[in-house]
Amino acid sequence: MRILWVKVGGLWPLDTGGRLRSFHTLAELTRRHRVTLVTTHGPRDEPAGLKARLAGCERIVSLPYAVPKQGTARFARALLRSWLSPLPVDLWKWRIPALREEVSRLMTAAQFDLCVADFLLATPSVPLNGPVPTVLFAHNVEHMIWKRLSHAEPRLWRRALLEVEWRKMRRYETEACTRARLTVAVSEADRALLAAHAPRARVCAIPTGVDTAYFTPNGSQETPGALVFTGSLDWFPNEDCIVHFGEVVFPRIREAVPDVSLTVVGRNPGPRVQRLAAIPGVRVTGTVQDVRPYVAAATLCVVPLRVGGGTRLKIFEALAMGKAVVSTTVGAEGLPLVPGRHFVQADEPAEFANAVVALLRDPARRKALGSAGRRLVEERYSWSQVVREFEARCEEVVAHAR
């Protein structure tokens, strides 16, 4: 197939779950298909590094674009304009005329069999019912993230704004799924949600993969009582959960296990996350080149998400390294894991703290959970297996379009 792949927000470095999922899918597809990638890069991204690591792409076009940041005049203008349009602000700020023009030009100039809109954020730049059949790669159910943010927001004025946003996002997401030839969700739970809201859409579920050769137990010594959290800290659900964990849950754990420590690993921590470093036993690393040493040194991994969508690659990566994981229901949502067999599930602060304390005191239980998790991802969720399924669904779309 000749594939046109469109993604906003950059792809390199691989410092978010979405980038990892997109990168590994593309890397596998380029082994067997002719792929043109059209993307954007911000001030901290590395387009040259991307081209070197996706050398199998027939062509890569990366346009400079800095997304408006909250609190800036550009963001205020985007917010105002989005209020006057059907687009929610999260999509309005990713409207990139130059990108849309480049996509239209390529669709006219080349004979593509398929276009992939990578994330809902790419759809303002892609004609979903245009001349090339389009697949929407939905890493999240976006409106559910905004809905959960609305319900978790304590300030009434902000909750009212978020209420408007999630309803606009639901309308747009429903329309986009309906217009695309196929929507690929990353879990059965997401597939069911999208299908319920867009009954005329064709939606399938393809699981998330993990690089089981890169994330592997390395036999290094664990630090006793060490907890680790990994994730992009400029994504609000990650910021929200780790601040809540550090301020509410971690002190409960420390009462029972005084020498417990918490390492927060991830890019772009804001002031709220940075302030956690003032709590005894907490370390905030900021951006790191490689998360594996931090995961390897940890006694267990915590995923205390309260809002979110899609699937959490951080859990698969921890399991691939043979680590025990304590996660909320939302944190493990969409992953094919059995609570009690592959991870420990806990939601309320006291319940989560008790689960962590129990595992810190039970090395045999930690080892059993980590071993079961490693077996699961190794046997069923390598990227080569997952992308073969993605590829087959794309080939069906192309066959039906002929």
Residue ranges and their predicted role:
Residues 343-350, 358-363:
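Conserved acidic donor-binding segment of nucleotide-sugar-dependent glycosyltransferases
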Residues 365-379, 386-392:
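A short, well-ordered alpha-helix in the C-terminal region of glycosyltransferases
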Residues 314-317, 324-328:
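Short hydrophobic beta-strand element within catalytic cores of glycosyltransferases
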Residues 135, 143, 162-217:
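Donor nucleotide-sugar binding/catalytic pocket of nucleotide-sugar-dependent glycosyltransferases
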